[in-house]
Swiss-Prot record:
This is Dihydrosphingosine 1-phosphate phosphatase C823.11. Belongs to the type 2 lipid phosphate phosphatase family. Residues 144-147 are annotated as: Phosphatase sequence motif II. It comes from Schizosaccharomyces pombe (strain 972 / ATCC 24843). It is found in: Endoplasmic reticulum membrane. The active site is at 147 (proton donor), 198 (nucleophile). Gene3D superfamilies: Phosphatidic acid phosphatase type 2/haloperoxidase. Residues 115-123 are annotated as: Phosphatase sequence motif I. Residues 191-202 are annotated as: Phosphatase sequence motif III.
């Protein structure tokens, strides 16, 4: 389902998304389209929340809570999970890490689809004060809250797992971990309102979406685990086909939004993980948790050091390789219409997070350029292909290459 839009440029002075004149969205979606009608139905509800949200923020605000909620919000970001999840995987928590990674990717993808479909704004600022350590608020729509979706999905899945293990844990450990999970869920979801980043509808919809994803993942956990341990050739084929389908299916936003780029990145990571676990030998994966001994902490430190360096080297190598290879290939195949800019190199640097230049939008996963504003949007252009290669490579290296090295080095 590709949602086409007319080529409507947004003013350069426009800072936040979703607040254009109604004619902008009627031209982009079509005045009689279901998409436009639903947006017009929900928008007044979102706008009416502002006054109450401002009263709540004004009543509770103090410097300590400002710092607390701004920093705890980083626990629901892409950067935190991109750093934490490989480390959990290399520590031997294989299936839990794969479950959480898949949940996080699903949360980013489905919340991004809804955001880009409805193109609804965040709470008005002013009067709301937006408290954030990131500038991403300028480049994302508000409905629903991706932070809340991810917190609810990963938090509730962790709760389900914790409850299933309650009989085998001490009371102190159980209630300590339970408190941490509940604190995490509450801090992220309530913090979105306190920080002025989202309204009640954003958070409540994110909650419903996140809990639904957690229940689905928990119910079909055994199925996914069997897929990751399967040797059937249908696994890598279906993984690639589904990844490309989900990227194609993602709605086209009315304005330049980073949701599509984030979705492409995480769908690609999952594809890389599926391929990596399929190619990986059972010995290399079992070694991750069978190597628990008195030297485990030292060996684990070496694993993390090697793994982080591996990812950094891969990103650097992939960028340079793509800069050298992709543009000539596209030109030789006469696929210049897939190049969103006349200077393909700049576009590839942007897609792979290589540099920041005027006109680019910085994100936690890289930078985007005019990919979205191409007169005739093409989903699989050079920028998209570059992003798929880079991030699927990260997933593949973390689940295949790194465990293979750890086994060979006996660490």
């Amino acid at each position: 389902m590709v949602h086409k839009k007319k080529n409507v440029d947004i003013p350069s002075s426009q800072k936040y998304l979703g607040i254009q004149h109604v004619n902008f969205y009627s031209n982009a979606f079509g005045k009689e389209s279901l998409r436009f009608q639903l947006r017009e139905l929900i928008l007044p509800i979102v706008r009416k929340e502002t006054r109450l949200l401002y009263k709540i923020q004004s009543f509770f605000r103090n410097p300590w809570l400002d710092v607390y909620f701004m920093y705890t919000a980083t626990l629901g970001t892409h950067v935190f999970f991109m750093l934490a999840l490989p480390i959990f995987f290399w520590s031997g928590c294989i299936y839990y890490t794969l479950d959480i990674t898949q949940l996080f990717a699903a949360g980013v993808y489905f919340s991004g689809c809804i955001k880009d479909y409805f193109c609804l704004p965040r709470p008005r600022s002013p009067p709301m004060v937006r408290l954030t350590l990131s500038s991403d608020a300028e480049y994302e729509y508000g409905f629903p809250s991706t932070h809340t979706t991810n917190a609810m999905a990963t938090g509730f899945y962790s709760l389900f797992l914790l409850l299933s293990m309650s009989d085998s844990m001490s009371s102190i450990s159980y209630y300590f971990l339970l408190s941490l999970v509940l604190l995490y869920i509450a801090s992220i979801s309530l913090g979105r309102i306190y920080c002025g980043m989202h309204g009640f509808m954003d958070v409540s919809t994110g909650t419903i979406l996140g809990v639904t994803l957690a229940i689905f993942q928990w119910k079909y956990a055994d199925f996914f685990h069997n897929v990751w341990s399967s040797s059937s050739t249908s696994v890598p084929i279906l993984s690639v086909v589904l990844a490309l389908f989900f990227i194609w299916f993602h709605p086209q936003p009315a304005e330049r939004c980073i949701c599509l780029e984030d979705s492409i990145s995480f769908i690609s990571v999952i594809m890389g993980i599926d391929l990596g676990t399929w190619f990986a030998s059972p010995e290399s994966l079992s070694h991750l948790h069978d190597n628990l001994n008195s030297y485990f902490l030292l060996k684990f430190f070496v694993r993390v050091l090697f793994g982080v360096c591996m990812i950094l080297i891969w990103k650097s190598f992939a960028k340079q390789a793509l800069l050298a290879v992709l543009p000539p290939i596209f030109k030789s195949l006469r696929l210049s219409y897939l190049e969103p800019k006349s200077q393909s190199e700049k576009g590839i640097r942007a897609a792979t997070g290589s540099n920041h230049s005027p006109g680019n939008i910085g994100t936690e996963l890289g930078v985007i350029t005019s990919h979205q504003s191409h007169p005739h949007p093409v989903r699989f252009d050079i920028e998209t292909i570059a992003r798929i290669i880079v991030y699927s490579g990260i997933g593949f290296l973390c689940t295949y290459f790194a465990p293979k090295v750890f086994l060979k080095w006996k660490i």
